Amino acid sequence: MDRFGDISEGEVDHSFFDSDFEDAKKCESNSIFDKQNDDDLKEGINKDTKNVNLKFGVQNDHLKEKIDNNTENVNLKLGLQTTENYLTQKGNERKANFSSKEQHIENDPTQARSSSVLTSSRSKKSCDATKGHKLNLPVPDRIPKIVKGEDDYYTDGEESSDDGKKYVRSKSAKPSSNLKKNVSKKYSSSSLSSSSSRSNSDCSDMGSDRQRRSESHSSGKCVSSVTPSSPKQRCKSGRKSSAQPSSTKQKTGDYHESEGNVPDITPLSTPDVSPAQSLELGQPPDQKVKVKKQENVSRDVYEDAEALKNDSRCVKSAKRKEKHGQSFAPKSSVLDANLDRRSKQKVLHDTMDLNHLLKAFLQLDKKGPQKHHFEQPAIIPRKNYSFTREEVRQIDRENQRLLKELSRQAEKPGSKSTIPGRSIGHPPKLYHSALNRQREQQRIERENMALLKRLEAVKPTVGMKRSEQLMDYHRNMSYLNPSPSVRRVRSTLGHYSPLRGASRTSSATSGLSCKTDRSVLDTSNGFLLRPKPPNVRTAWL
């Protein structure tokens, strides 16, 4: 009571209540902050778990796609190996058949040479086919390695995208460990299933091809010696060998599986029904065997080309599946795929060129003996049965010699005297009528020849030209009437003066007309003509 003695009765001590209120406020604020912190932690944990779940879901999808691609690539590789082994075995069987057939045809050297050429071309084709298979193997993508000691597992493509989220990993390490364990278990189970499928396919392949491995190794050596491996291909082969799990070595007891499990991808050979076979009817048996060999070689070429086409189709389908996951694959895989496609196209073109060349050679070989067969001379039937062939040849030679001598004598200038004529001998006796007719004919010929000589010797008379006759006429007319008409006559004379070269008959007629006119004028008028100059001669004198 002493403490509160100084306090008045009506007053209340508020300090006590204030302290209690402050304590309650502090408790409430602390509880609120604790709740907020718990909510923040829960939200962060939920976000972290969601991110981890999403990341591991993406990783699981990516791993599943890669595992599927790898299994498909391994299956393709095994299928290609089976086709290689099948082709090599088939080639060996055909070689054995050819060797057995060649023993029957050893007497024909040309056929032996053609068979050696065919076997060498077959070996080249088989090497080229194995080379194309080796080059065309698809390269599987690299499987990411899982390290047991690391809790945080991320691929190379995800590290670049998750650099800004490292603080989330540190917070969510404990809840994500369980999820990672589950994912690792799933991955191990999927890898075991893929490895079991691989081991089953390997076992079936090895069970069916145990006897052919030696041949495939020899063909592989041939291909490796022909095609030098680049450092990129070596790295890829190392990755392939490291990517295969060790579980394939465990199941070796299943090698007794039948060969029917391996799919047979070899195409059916179409029957060669060509019009060239109709030419084989009239050929000897040796040529028939040779043509059969050539047809077998052409079939082998077609089968190899079709097998390569089927392999290219399988690889294209695998590439289409791989294209869906190209966002995760690096650019180097795209470049490798382009290189593989180019190499496949080149191999296909080479095989087609070889096929065309072989077809051309086969056609030439078929046409060659036929030409020789038709070039043989046919037997000419005898036309002259009275003489033997030797006598006929001698007669022909003698005739040719005589003909040459006669032609040589005919070409000489004095050949008429040398060649005997029948007209030189005594003529046959004729009847009297024929003799009289011959004498009359000879007399007529003599008279004609004398007349011809006389006509040739006659010279033309002077003053018989037309111009001279006209001048003479006008001169005479001027003597008779010296009137103005004379001028007109002179003008006409000047007009006619250039016309010369008339015939003798026309000049003669003009001369006669002038003569008659002159005589008429002389008798009628009685004029006396003056004497002419001595150098002028008239036509009628």
UniProtKB/Swiss-Prot annotation:
Presence of the UniProt keyword Phosphoprotein in the record: yes
InterPro entries: Cfap97/Hemingway, Hmw/CFAP97
Pfam families: Hmw_CFAP97
Coiled-coil residue spans: 382-459
Comp. bias intervals (Low complexity): 176-201
Modified residue annotations for Phosphoserine: S8, S19, S160, S161, S230, S258
Biased composition (Basic and acidic residues): 35-47, 93-107, 142-151, 207-218, 287-296
Chain segments annotated as transmembrane: none
Biased segments, Acidic residues type: 152-161
PTM-bearing positions, type Phosphothreonine: T155
Polar residues biased stretches: 219-232, 240-250, 267-277, 503-513
Sequence segments annotated as region (Disordered): 28-47, 93-296, 313-337, 406-430, 495-514
Lineage: superkingdom: Eukaryota
Tissue expr: Highly expressed in testis with lower levels detected in other tissues including lung, heart and kidney.
Keyword annotations of the record: Coiled coil, Phosphoprotein
PANTHER family per record: CILIA- AND FLAGELLA-ASSOCIATED PROTEIN 97 (PTHR23035:SF1), CILIA- AND FLAGELLA-ASSOCIATED PROTEIN 97-RELATED (PTHR23035)
Family assignment from sequence similarity: Belongs to the CFAP97 family.
Name of the molecule in the record: Cilia- and flagella-associated protein 97
Gene: Cfap97
